[in-house]
From Swiss-Prot:
UniProt source species: Rickettsia akari (strain Hartford)
Cofactor binding note from Swiss-Prot or TrEMBL: Binds 1 zinc ion per subunit.
Protein name from the UniProt record: Queuine tRNA-ribosyltransferase
Claim: tRNA processing is one of the keywords in the record: yes
Description of how the protein assembles with itself and partners: Homodimer. Within each dimer, one monomer is responsible for RNA recognition and catalysis, while the other monomer binds to the replacement base PreQ1.
Biological process, per Gene Ontology: queuosine biosynthetic process; tRNA wobble guanine modification; tRNA-guanine transglycosylation
Length: 361
């Protein structure tokens, strides 16, 4: 079994490419993680997700603790076996979903008490419980429990939230069961305030996490402000540890973030957009529902290797999506995930060659 490690093989300005070694295989970085929130990437077979080029996918503590429960998944052999995915899995701590989905939530020093958005049942999620759930799931990369600071927020509110996240990070770190090839990442907060981001990073770096995530971005602040934060926040983190920008996945955002030193990304954009009939291509986005595609006998992209492009026309995809056929969601999602993995692969190649990349400026 491989030890968890991160080796940077190439660097161009602030952009890095390398390999994360884990108990479940290697992750090429920069890496884009498809989101498999409930133990599945919507409208995709796990083996099909791997065929798009994904080295790792994301699962979610909040959703899996509610259905079918972490204990049941553990009894059935863990999340990898449960969903037939033998590559690395990173699990979100559940904090963001508790804040965004649950009603009647109450945040205390202990954790967050909340009602399930499914049936109203009462739950308590603490740093210790979140870490234990991720252990039961068998997550390759466990995320520390945090409070995702909303936007807009005052300096004092952001400071209070960041300090709570730091205290929770201590408890998450203490609760983590170390195993060879497995890792735990801390999450820095601080909203758009440089002083708070630096304080947060300093507190977490002292805990010697295996990697670090930048949370609390892509929550409404806009690209310009997000990039402003990314101009300084990665510099507060160790050079030899992976850096993960949570919830960010627009192509232009990925490119801008890699140029600022980010190594890992996740986002629902390619899958959600695919199910809604939007395709990403090198020529821009295509809304396949548009009537102008009803008689278009060309593929979405001529040089794309995905089944949607090699076997079907825009007219057929238009038909499937317009009538709500499941195959339409499957093909559009497959295409988008292939596009995103091809994009990230091109970025890795440009870094290796020492070339600037700005495909979406």
């Amino acid at each position: 079994m491989s030890k968890f490690s991160f080796n940077i093989h190439h660097q161009h300005k602030k952009a890095r490419s390398g390999i994360i070694a884990t108990a479940h295989g290697e992750i090429r970085t920069p890496a884009f993680m498809p989101v498999g929130t409930r133990g599945t990437v919507k409208a995709m077979l796990p083996e099909s997700v791997a065929e798009t080029g994904a080295d790792i996918l994301l699962g979610n503590t909040y959703h899996l603790m509610l259905q079918p429960s972490a204990e049941r998944i553990a009894r059935l052999g863990g999340l990898h076996k449960f969903m037939n995915w033998d590559k690395p899995i990173l699990t979100d701590s559940g904090g963001f979903q508790v804040m965004s989905l649950s009603k009647l939530r109450k945040i205390t020093e202990e954790g967050v008490s909340f009602s399930s958005h499914i049936n109203g049942d009462k739950y308590m999620l603490t740093p210790e419980r979140s870490t234990a759930i991720q252990y039961l799931l068998g997550s390759t990369i466990t995320m520390a429990f945090d409070e995702c600071t909303p936007y807009p927020v005052t300096f004092e509110e952001a400071k209070t939230s960041m300090q709570l996240t730091t205290r929770w990070a201590h408890r998450s770190r203490n609760a983590f069961v170390k195993r060879e090839g497995y890792a735990q990442f801390g999450i820095i907060q601080g909203s758009v305030y440089e002083e708070l981001r630096e304080q947060s990073a300093k507190g977490l770096v002292e805990l010697d996490f295996d990697g670090y995530a930048i949370g609390g971005l892509a929550v409404g602040e806009g690209q310009e402000l997000m990039f402003k934060v990314l101009d300084y926040a990665p510099d507060f983190l160790p050079q030899n540890k992976p850096r993960y920008l949570m919830g960010v996945g627009k192509p232009a955002d990925i490119i801008g973030a890699v140029n600022r030193g980010i190594d890992m990304f996740d986002c629902v954009i390619p899958t959600r957009s695919g199910r809604n009939g939007q395709a990403f291509t090198k020529y821009g986005t295509v809304n396949i529902c548009n009537s102008k595609y009803s008689g278009d006998n060309e593929p979405l992209e001529h040089d794309c290797p995905c089944p949607a492009c090699t076997n079907y026309t825009k007219a057929y995809l238009h038909h499937l999506v317009r009538i709500g056929e499941i195959l339409g969601s499957m093909l559009m999602t497959w295409h988008n995930l292939t596009y995103f993995q091809n994009l990230i692969s091109r970025i890795r190649e440009y870094i290796k060659l020492g070339k600037d990349f700005d495909f979406y400026s």
